[in-house]
Amino acid sequence: MKSLNNKVGFSSLNISIVLLILMISLLARYLVSLNGYSGQSKPPMFGDYEAQRHWMEITTNLDIHQWYFNSTDNDLMYWGLDYPPLTAYLSWVFGKIGEFIEPKSMELFTSRGYETDSGKLFMRMTVIVSDLFIWLPSVWFFVKTFYKQRNISQQISAFLFISLQPGLLLIDHGHFQYNGVSLGLGLFAITFIIRDQQLLASFFFVLSLNYKQMCLYYSPAFFFYLLLSNFEFTLKFSKIFSSIFKILKIGIVVIFTFILCWIPFLSIEQASQVLFRLFPFARGLYEDKVANFWCFISIIINVKNLFTTDQLIKICLILTLVTMLPLVYGIKRIPKNKFVFIHSLINSSFSFFLFSFQVHEKTILLVSLPISLLILHHPNMVWWFILISTFSMFPLLFKDGLVIPYFAIMILYIVIGYQFKNSITRSNNQFKHQNSQENLLASSDKSFYSIYLNYWFYLNIIGMVVCHLLYQFAPHPPHLPSLWLLLVCNFSFIHFILTFFYFIKEMTTFSPIKIKSN
């Protein structure tokens, strides 16, 4: 136990610092949770808060084989379960606890739209507890692994920056979701990759996929990294056999973990129904307006009218796969490199968000995670991207009545984060002289895009303020009801696409710096 504590860094921290970090993290979540949420007091469908509560109701009251099927007891048109089995299992656990604490909150049918103060407190606490046991430990584990050569103050700064991302706070503890669970499981997988513990990485990544299918955004990066880092292109039989054996072990772990998660749903009937619920292509190219490529070009070309749904699915698939080719090149060029791997996650998740079929505005959180992990290497870029990604979700947060916490968090983030990133930049100037392995990354923020951010920062802040004012107060032209919404989305998209190309350039021009195995 002592050696394990030393590895993850707990022994180097004073207990008071640990408690202070936890207090700050939990207090921020609690304060956000005091505000509105998705669909509050808006019958008959309410919103995501009711969806999560309803899943607890369904899993608590119905047999497990009825969870994903339409029936008189389970109307799939009313927030039918459409997440993978681990979400259902966690809903069952929370549902049983909720049933014990407040039975009426989980009664079948009669609990629809249940919004008592005690019920809301319980629901909010389930998200906070999930963060406490999954998201926050995963961030700390990553920081102590990836930034092990940094001093403790830099590690704490990185932990707070990653764990207190405004977008994730507002969506999970305001709007109401459990993204911290899927992202936390995914981050454990990322950290185990960095530690060269690939079997554990595979196990945790499959868990993240089985909690939320959107973690597929990371799957190409994991697949090609694991494949290309283990397979040696050689004519020696012994090395070929060794490569195949390594890949086979990973495959066994992946299959075993999937089977473990899907045990109740392994019949053809059950599995096909669950998959049908997980991938609802009938919903269309995107829901509402989202800051991606398809929404951007819709102001010029209405692709929904030009192509059928099947054609759009194929076009999206081709474009998404083509824009992922840089990650294959990057990993093949420098295999087993921690920086290339994180950049490949950025490439993969960005390609899905910008070009794939059926994208939600909240899925930008999947892009924000790998980008935020590079905070001590790209402080300017990371700080600005997290700001823009949160801004891109403003229309959704406005609809949820989260304007006050949104502006409070954004202002704090701009003021404190601006000073914070400058402090990191100064620390990097000292650190790069001490560690030749990370010299390139520590100084890589001195790029064209960094200069762009520094000189155009105030102009873009003004642009964001104008977008906010127009969206909230200016009447839209009668024939253009989505004008201000499109303005917010397209303003965000321009920054997203620039960031996308920036990190592709970084990944494909790295010097061959090899990561040392822990």
UniProtKB/Swiss-Prot annotation:
Catalytic activity of the protein: an alpha-D-Man-(1->2)-alpha-D-Man-(1->2)-alpha-D-Man-(1->3)-[alpha-D-Man-(1->2)-alpha-D-Man-(1->3)-[alpha-D-Man-(1->2)-alpha-D-Man-(1->6)]-alpha-D-Man-(1->6)]-beta-D-Man-(1->4)-beta-D-GlcNAc-(1->4)-alpha-D-GlcNAc-diphospho-di-trans,poly-cis-dolichol + a di-trans,poly-cis-dolichyl beta-D-glucosyl phosphate = an alpha-D-Glc-(1->3)-alpha-D-Man-(1->2)-alpha-D-Man-(1->2)-alpha-D-Man-(1->3)-[alpha-D-Man-(1->2)-alpha-D-Man-(1->3)-[alpha-D-Man-(1->2)-alpha-D-Man-(1->6)]-alpha-D-Man-(1->6)]-beta-D-Man-(1->4)-beta-D-GlcNAc-(1->4)-alpha-D-GlcNAc-diphospho-di-trans,poly-cis-dolichol + a di-trans,poly-cis-dolichyl phosphate + H(+)
Pathway: Protein modification; protein glycosylation
GO cellular component, one term: endoplasmic reticulum membrane
Subcellular location: Endoplasmic reticulum membrane
UniProt family annotation: Belongs to the ALG6/ALG8 glucosyltransferase family.
Domain of life: Eukaryota
Membrane-spanning parts: 8-28, 127-147, 174-194, 215-235, 247-267, 311-331, 339-359, 368-388, 396-416, 451-471, 484-504
Database matches in InterPro entries: Glyco_trans_ALG6/ALG8
The protein's name: Probable dolichyl pyrophosphate Man9GlcNAc2 alpha-1,3-glucosyltransferase
A single GO BP: dolichol-linked oligosaccharide biosynthetic process
PANTHER family from the UniProt entry: DOLICHYL GLYCOSYLTRANSFERASE, DOLICHYL PYROPHOSPHATE MAN9GLCNAC2 ALPHA-1,3-GLUCOSYLTRANSFERASE
Residue positions the entry lists as glycosylated: 70
Nucleotide-binding as UniProt keyword: no
Enzyme class: transferase
Organism per entry: Dictyostelium discoideum
Topology, Cytoplasmic side: 1-7, 148-173, 236-246, 332-338, 389-395, 472-483
Parts of the chain on the Lumenal side: 29-126, 195-214, 268-310, 360-367, 417-450, 505-518
Bilayer disposition of the protein: Multi-pass membrane protein
EC number from the UniProt entry: 2.4.1.267
Entry GO MF terms: dolichyl pyrophosphate Man9GlcNAc2 alpha-1,3-glucosyltransferase activity
Record's keyword terms, sorted: Endoplasmic reticulum, Glycoprotein, Glycosyltransferase, Membrane, Transferase, Transmembrane, Transmembrane helix
The protein's role, per its UniProt record: Probable dolichyl pyrophosphate Man9GlcNAc2 alpha-1,3-glucosyltransferase that operates in the biosynthetic pathway of dolichol-linked oligosaccharides, the glycan precursors employed in protein asparagine (N)-glycosylation. The assembly of dolichol-linked oligosaccharides begins on the cytosolic side of the endoplasmic reticulum membrane and finishes in its lumen. The sequential addition of sugars to dolichol pyrophosphate produces dolichol-linked oligosaccharides containing fourteen sugars, including two GlcNAcs, nine mannoses and three glucoses.
